[in-house]
From Swiss-Prot:
Family membership: Belongs to the cytochrome b family.
Species this chain originates from: Pantherophis vulpinus
InterPro entries on file: Cyt_b/b6_C, Cyt_b/b6_C_sf, Cyt_b/b6_N, Cytb/b6-like_sf, Cytochrome_b, Cytochrome_b_C_euk/bac, Cytochrome_b_N_euk/bac, Di-haem_cyt_TM
Subunit text: The cytochrome bc1 complex contains 3 respiratory subunits (MT-CYB, CYC1 and UQCRFS1), 2 core proteins (UQCRC1 and UQCRC2) and probably 6 low-molecular weight proteins.
Entry's transmembrane regions: 25-45, 69-90, 105-125, 170-190, 218-238, 280-300, 312-332, 339-358
Protein name as catalogued: Cytochrome b
Keyword Cell membrane: no
Intracellular or extracellular location(s): Mitochondrion inner membrane
Other information: Heme 1 (or BL or b562) is low-potential and absorbs at about 562 nm, and heme 2 (or BH or b566) is high-potential and absorbs at about 566 nm.
The organism's taxonomic lineage, starting at the top: Eukaryota, Metazoa, Chordata, Craniata, Vertebrata
């Protein structure tokens, strides 16, 4: 009997009839999560969390384990797909005012923070040059915390430098956090289904709802197919497109790479971090670059939920998208002019979106009131 109720919940779940393709990314994220969990499990079977053997175990997986190359590439490219989907998912939430469903938005932002931590721990595991030095630079930011910073850093490292205990605990965290993500995702979906999804118009969908299956389930299946096809095309033809060439060399604490940078999906935050020439200031800006999303439900002043009929906010939104892309590009470049200036300007523009949001909402309300 409970199974029957579960099927009814899936089949007869009422969903607004006018939700567009941008609402498909939630289910695509679920697919990515399932894929990452499965491939990650098979990789963990053959991986060795030891600084002398970690790099060799990755080589062993790709060369000797049957289909190991496929698992390793799917896991690496799948992480990039995960972040592409989540950034589009967040952009849709910002554009269509999904953040007004406070509980869903706050649980989603928490999920993003946990996901970023998981991806960071995973990037360290191959113990390549960039893995080691990215871990050194990012964990070293904890020393910026007043009074307890040094103790915190040593506690995280398990010693006075990044060494074997660090790799062991990062592997343990990388293994356990996805289960936290799965639990949080369930809460996120349950909270969503108490109120239901928003729609492109930003209106109440109650007057025009259709069953999730077969209508939206088929639309989701199409996007799954496109995503999996893209994943396999990248894996087959350009499997190392998202990798850093430095990471094909084993970690060497005595040789510093010319330009230390994290994976591409953290470059926007890294760009904001290095745009401030102060360690504590940069660390605060880095944390704010993600946590500022938490302010969105509380700073919304417009009478309209969606940006569909708000041209001023649309302009700000697309400026944010362009800023995000530019800051990501600038963060791949060395710390020298003009890239430092570009980084600083784009960092200001990034935070400007969140500060202008309540002001433009208030202005649009004034304009609409004078026109009626």
């Amino acid at each position: 009997m409970p199974n029957q109720h579960m099927l009814l919940l899936f089949n007869l779940l009422p969903v607004g009839s006018n939700i567009s393709i941008w609402w498909n990314f939630g289910s695509m994220l679920l697919t990515c999560l399932a894929l990452q969990t499965m491939t990650g499990f098979f990789l963990a079977i053959h991986y060795t969390a030891n600084i002398n053997l970690a790099f060799s175990s990755i080589v062993h997986i790709t060369r000797d384990v049957p289909y190991g190359w496929m698992m390793q590439n799917l896991h690496a490219i799948g992480a990039s797909m995960f972040f592409i989907c989540i950034y589009i998912h967040i952009a849709r939430g910002l554009y269509y005012g999904s953040f007004l469903n406070k509980n869903v938005w706050l649980s989603g932002t928490t999920l993003l923070i946990i996901l970023m931590a998981t991806a960071f721990f995973g990037y360290v595991l191959p113990w390549g040059q960039m893995s080691f030095w990215a871990a050194t630079v990012i964990t070293n930011l904890l020393t910026a915390v007043p009074y307890i910073g040094t103790e915190l850093t040593n506690w995280l490292w398990g010693g006075f430098s990044i060494n074997d205990p660090t790799l062991t605990r990062f592997f343990a965290l990388h293994f356990i956090l996805p289960f936290t993500i799965i639990s949080m995702s369930s809460i996120h979906i349950m909270l969503l289904h108490t109120e239901g999804s928003s729609n492109p118009l930003g209106t109440n969908s109650d007057i025009d709802k259709i069953p999730f299956h077969p209508y939206h389930s088929h639309k989701d299946m199409l996007m799954f197919t496109i995503m999996i096809t893209m994943l396999f095309i990248i894996m087959s033809f350009t499997p190392n497109i998202f990798n850093d060439p430095e990471n094909f060399s084993k970690a060497n604490p005595l040789v510093t790479p010319q330009h230390i940078k994290p994976e591409w999906y953290f470059l926007f935050a890294y760009g904001i971090l290095r745009s401030i020439p102060n360690k504590l200031g940069g660390t605060v800006a880095l944390v704010l670059s993600v946590t500022i999303l938490l302010t969105m439900p509380f700073t919304h002043t417009s009478h309209m939920r969606s940006m569909t009929f708000r041209p001023l906010m649309q302009f700000m939104f697309w400026t944010l998208v362009a800023t995000f892309i530019t800051i990501t590009w600038a963060a791949t470049k060395p710390v020298e002019p003009p890239f430092t200036s570009i980084g600083q300007v784009t960092a200001i523009l990034y935070f400007l979106f969140f500060t202008m949001n309540p002001l433009l909402g208030w202005l649009e309300n004034k304009i609409s009131m004078t026109n009626t």
